[in-house]
Amino acid sequence: IVIIVSVIIFQASQALYSGFLVYFFTYGIKDLNLYATFVAIGTVTQVAALILFPRISKVVGRKNVYTIACILTVLGFGGMFIVSGMGNSILLCLAGIAYNLGVGLINAATTVMISNAVDYGEYKLGKRSESIIFSAQTFIVKFSTAFSGLIIGFGLSLIKYVPNATQTASTIFGMKVIMFLIPAVLMVICAVVYSKYYK
């Protein structure tokens, strides 16, 4: 149950962030070339995190990795919220690296936790249920994405977003709150739930 709750919260935060990202770079940063670079750096960082996960786990322990990863995403969200108005692409990318490093480690840790749940289920019940468990994970991801899509539509309406027009300062600020601050709060909750209840 803890894994399911953690995955739902994590996916919701990611969907809010990624759903607004292109709007943010189009109207907030006003640089789609930087958007492509930012996404590419993020992808490379997440792959690097997956590769480094086993080594980091050996040093700090798997449970601590997840908590540290949540902290990295929160720092990344906070950093992007602060520096996005400074016009400094390097600082923005550095904050993005912190965020994506956390995301990569969380993805790796979640896969390990699910595998452990399968093994534990086999130990306790005498049967492996990986197909059910991994299907449930896929369903959760799709459900979270769909639900966040509704929230994004509502959020755009709430901040008075006007397509293909210059956005007001309040609209840009609202966009940053939805894609950075709300996901940061969700990741704090995710870290607390995991740290307190995952054994």
Regions found by a protein language model. Name each.
Residues 1-199:
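Membrane-embedded alpha-helical bundles of multi-pass transporters/translocases
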